[in-house]
Amino acid sequence: LGDVYKRQSLYTADITRTFPTNGKFTDFQKKLYQAVLDSQQAGFEAAKPGATYSDIHHACMRVIAERLHDWGILPVDVEESLSPEGQQHRRWLACGVAHHLGLDVHDCAQARYESYQNAKIRPGMIFTIEPGLYFREDDLLIPPEYRGIGIRIEDDVLMTEDGPEWISAGIPKRIDDVEAWMADMAAEGVKA
């Protein structure tokens, strides 16, 4: 997992990619990676002028909870997990899934909840969408094949009048594209 940022003319970018160290995802890794990618896409689809960070967060979390349930990991049904009293899915994704970008990588991270999580997203705002799944090595409540795996996909988004635009779209994130990128780097002698 590589989480990198770039500062240009005082402004920042923040992007994360997860790579298979040998250049190819296993079928099991593909399943987990695709869940995170689908979660990110759900967050992107929820992002529109007038939406809130909470809307993006809930869209991403629904996909994560659904997949964890499908895999038999979530100890309750999806709706119970997504309820304010539940949140069992947060065991494997404990952080938020979006933040402002600007002069700081986590711009406005100290803002009050009502003026950040529930504030309306307006055209001109730039933010990330970055869901993930993190399975601890010592988590005995999950099957062994999940343990020690962490996946996050983070991209930068510009909100326009017409909706969101990926501004980090040039960096591969689809499974086939990541594997092709890894193969290109290996051919150039770059090691993962």
Go through the PLM ranges and name each one.
Residues 2-192:
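Active-site neighborhoods and metal-handling regions in enzymes and metal-associated proteins
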